[in-house]
Amino acid sequence: MAKDVEQVTEQGEYSAKDYHDPPPAPLIDPDELTKWSLYRAAIAEFIATLLFLYITVLTIIGYKRQSDTKIPGNTECDGVGILGIAWAFGGMIFILVYCTAGISGGHINPAVTFGLFLGRKVSLVRALLYMIAQCAGAICGAGLAKGFQKSFYNRYGGGVNTVSDGYNKGTALGAEIIGTFVLVYTVFSATDPKRNARDSHVPVLAPLPIGFAVFMVHLATIPVTGTGINPARSFGPAVIFNNDKAWDDQWIYWVGPFVGAAVAAIYHQYILRGSAIKALGSFRSNA
């Protein structure tokens, strides 16, 4: 077990503060399947992703309707614009992570779950169950949005993510990889147990930088891909809207986020935190 010792000064005296990394989550834990807390967490992920898709898809549709110049009195400058859409996505993530962090960890994104799995923060069983719940919630959330505003949903694209005209698939894939890297790197940094042990205010503030990361990435990548960085967010509307273009581009919104999440997990855990070096040192000391 890795151990860091920090010296803190208080009234001219030095005292040692020991910190131990929490044990890594097991790859497969059969006992976890018998615990209600696992299923409660999956339900929380389902509901959170449902609400996330419902609000954000309706925000996109509302913006497109308000800026539709075919409607008398509308101009291209009407509506919330890209800034408003980015705020809707970032704001909802902030709210939902805050609400569900103590129950499920507040992933609301298969890419985040995948990154945390690679970082040994969650087991394979929990990761798979979360991803299923997130995708199911996304489908239901997009379905609710269509149910409430069916005509506008069909007319304005249903919040589906596709590669924008003028950009090739390679550029779109790169945008998704980098955008997801920013998000997952922020998640690892905001939930770092060492920082949480040192600064008691960090866990309370964690939803804020995560939501703000989502906001900033949307500002940068909405013009390119519509911003996925969340496979469930792209999958749900694609299932409900069922458009050929959405399915043709769908792989970008899975491969990009998973690659970005993997790179972020490796960078944080094995370079910044030096987990590989610590593990090697522990192995040598035990030998």
Curated annotation (Swiss-Prot):
Q: What is its main location?
A: membrane
Keywords noted in UniProt: Cell membrane, Membrane, Repeat, Transmembrane, Transmembrane helix, Transport
Name the InterPro entries for this protein.
Answer: Aquaporin-like (IPR023271), Aquaporin_transptr (IPR034294), MIP (IPR000425), MIP_CS (IPR022357)
Q: Where is this region: Disordered?
A: 1-25
Q: Where are the transmembrane segments?
A: 41-61, 79-99, 128-148, 170-190, 202-222, 252-272
| One function term, GO molecular function aspect | water channel activity
Short sequence motif named NPA 2, residue ranges = 230-232
**What domain of life does the native source organism fall in?**
Eukaryota
Q: How does it sit in the membrane?
A: Multi-pass membrane protein
Where the record places motif NPA 1 is 109-111
The places in or outside the cell where this protein is found are: Cell membrane
GO cellular component terms, semicolon-separated: membrane; plasma membrane
Pfam families to which the protein is assigned, alphabetical? MIP
**Of which family is this protein a member?**
Belongs to the MIP/aquaporin (TC 1.A.8) family. PIP (TC 1.A.8.11) subfamily.
Q: Its function?
A: Aquaporins facilitate the transport of water and small neutral solutes across cell membranes.
Domain annotation text?
Answer: Aquaporins contain two tandem repeats each containing three membrane-spanning domains and a pore-forming loop with the signature motif Asn-Pro-Ala (NPA).
The protein's name: Aquaporin PIP2-7
Q: Tell me what gene encodes this.
A: PIP2-7
